[in-house]
A protein has these predicted regions:
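Short acidic-capped amphipathic helix/loop micro-motif used as an active-site/signal-coupling element
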Residues: 44-64, 85-88, 99-105, 119-130, ...
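Start-of-helix signal in alpha-solenoid helical-repeat scaffolds, especially tetratricopeptide repeats
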Residues: 20, 24, 48, 72-78, ...
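C-terminal non-catalytic interaction modules
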Residues: 160, 170, 410-413, 417, ...
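Short coil/turn linking the two alpha-helices of tandem helical-hairpin repeats
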Residues: 59, 92, 106-109, 133, ...
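Specific register positions within alpha-helical solenoid repeats of the TPR/Sel1-like families, i.e.
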Residues: 55-59, 106, 110, 152, ...
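Short, well-ordered secondary-structure microsegments
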Residues: 68-133, 141-154, 181-185, 189-192, ...
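C-terminal boundary/linker of central alpha/beta nucleotide-binding cores
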Residues: 1-37, 41-49, 89-106, 119-123
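Extended non-membrane alpha-helical scaffolds
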Residues: 152-169, 173-419, 423-426
Length: 522
């Protein structure tokens, strides 16, 4: 009390336990006295060992305590953790203490979305572990998994990401550790699907189902359902995707500790609902898709990666697809803000790409193209991934509208080639439709016939995938062409046959556009 009264110690009384913190000047004075007494090394070691024990206790409590309560207790220790790790890996420190502390502190970094800090600390710890050192095998497994997760969300599906998850899985199998086998399989699935290797990702998903079959946690068995559902969506099987994703959404058991967020760096329920929102829009339920994406944001707020995923993969694109540009602007701003605050460059790059699409829809083509290039530059090696393809189509449309038709066709051809090579078939209908629209911009003989062929291919793809929204887009483009060619009866019959299958979403941009064309044809 006297030290507090003299302003040498600060008291923190914002919780059930009063905590005391030395002011910087007092801390510097104490360190000087310790050094002078010759006790600094011994005290610093005890300090590091104490916080190693603190975080090992925190690691065991993570899966049993409510997340907010756990974070309130241990989140305030982040500076002590950093200081202890700095000593442990210093020339006068003890790397073995540092390795143990780093492995135990992973839940704190993950839950606090300090992924870049996690990556650098984990890489430092791994550098001190000898290859094949059996005494540290379990800690190395945890560190490899943490490295894979932090790399995935900060740099994307780079080779180092896959290598980290592969090593973690190998160690987990050697230790017969089913928990880390599941985590590593999730990481490898995320790596392969992001990199466009769908068949490999499906094999990983099936393997995860096998491992999870004997687990006591029912949520573990839903991980494979989620994996398969997401794969089905991107491959173009929307009915199949919906079945798997709805099972996850319906059967998921919420727990206060929400340990799955740390285990898989995503809220499983929120992740399934984000993809389900996309499926609903594709199937012709834009209002349901919008409501699903909106409600998902609240569920995902507990974790920055989950929130960025919900925004980038569902809320932003669905707002753009439905033509709600005010909502799109809000979601894009939220995505850019959160990804910047938590140093998540991949999600920030996606935010720039969505911002570009928003500018393009508003007619600001120069800004849109500039933002698109900036987003592509920031994506770096992640441009090889499946999520890059729709952004290429945005660029192709903008280039065409800006009069750079040849460049636009080159961009859409690249998108179609990537789509075919990676089996990202969900967007093939829209790519073919855009190619047809770009062909019509050319003043060359035979372009109308070529465009019509592309529109009909787009219709076929959409119908095979039960993607009613893309079917409407293709039907609208083809009906407009038929109308321009003096074939209003054909145009009316085609467009009515698609438009009248919708039961909602009549105020969205595509349906308003289709209705306006139908009215003009009558």
């Amino acid at each position: 009390a006297n030290l507090v009264a003299k302003s040498l110690v600060a008291a923190e009384v914002d919780g059930p336990v009063t905590r005391y913190r030395l002011l910087d000047t007092a801390r510097a004075y104490a360190l000087e006295k310790l050094a002078g007494s010759g006790e600094l090394e011994a005290v610093t070691r005890r300090y590091a060992e104490y916080y190693r024990d603190v975080f090992e206790r925190a690691e065991t409590e993570w899966e049993t305590r409510p997340a907010t309560e756990w974070l309130a207790d241990y989140g305030r220790q982040i500076d002590n953790l950093r200081a202890a790790l700095d000593w442990a890996f210093s020339p006068d420190g003890d790397a073995s203490v540092g390795v143990a502390m780093t492995a135990a502190a992973v839940p704190l970094w993950m839950h606090s979305s300090l992924l870049d800090e996690c990556r650098t600390r984990v890489e430092r710890a791994l550098a001190t572990i000898k290859v094949g050192e059996t005494a540290n095998a379990r800690r190395e497994m945890k560190l490899r998994a943490a490295l894979g997760a932090s790399l995935l969300y900060t740099r994307g599906a780079v080779p180092e990401t896959g290598a980290a998850w592969t090593k973690a899985l190998k160690i987990a199998e050697s230790l017969d550790d089913a928990e880390y086998q599941l985590r590593s399989l999730w990481g490898l699935w995320s790596f392969h699907i992001t990199d466009g290797h769908y068949r490999v990702a499906l094999a990983v998903a099936q393997r995860s189902c096998t491992v999870a079959a004997n687990r006591s946690d029912p949520n573990d068995r839903l991980i494979g359902e989620h994996m398969v559902g997401v794969l089905r969506h991107y491959q173009g099987d929307q009915p199949g995707a919906r079945r798997h994703l709805e099972r996850v959404f319906t059967n998921y058991a919420t727990a206060d500790h929400r340990s799955h967020i740390m285990r898989f760096q995503i809220d499983l329920r929120a992740g399934a609902r984000a993809t389900l929102a996309r499926v609903l829009w594709l199937q012709g339920f834009p209002d349901q898709a919008t409501r699903t994406a909106e409600s998902n944001i609240e569920d995902a707020r507990a974790n920055a990666s989950s929130l960025c995923s919900a925004l980038a993969l569902a809320a932003c694109p669905i707002a753009l697809w439905t033509g709600d540009l005010t909502a799109a602007e809000s979601y894009v701003g939220m995505l850019l803000n959160r990804s910047t605050r938590h140093a998540l460059p991949i999600w920030h790059a996606f935010g720039l790409c969505h911002q570009a699409a928003l500018a393009i829809k508003r007619g600001d083509l120069n800004t849109g193209l500039w933002l698109q290039h900036a987003g592509f530059d920031d994506l770096g090696e992640a441009k090889t991934g499946f999520r890059f393809i729709p952004y290429l189509s945005d660029m192709a449309e903008a280039l065409g509208r800006a009069g750079q038709i040849a460049d636009g066709i080159a961009a859409i051809d690249e998108a179609i080639e990537r789509c075919e090579r990676t089996e990202v078939h969900w967007v093939m209908s829209e790519l073919l439709r855009i190619k047809g629209e770009l062909l019509l911009l050319q003043a060359a003989p035979g372009v109308a016939a070529a465009a019509e062929d592309h529109f009909r291919q787009a219709l076929d793809w959409a119908r095979r995938q039960s993607a009613l929204s893309f079917e409407l887009c293709a039907a609208t483009s083809l009906a407009q062409l038929q109308s321009d060619q003096g074939r209003p009866a054909d145009a009316m019959a085609l467009l009515q046959s698609v438009y009248h299958r919708f039961t909602e979403g009549f105020e969205t941009a595509d349906l308003r556009g289709a209705k306006a064309l139908l009215d003009a044809l009558q």
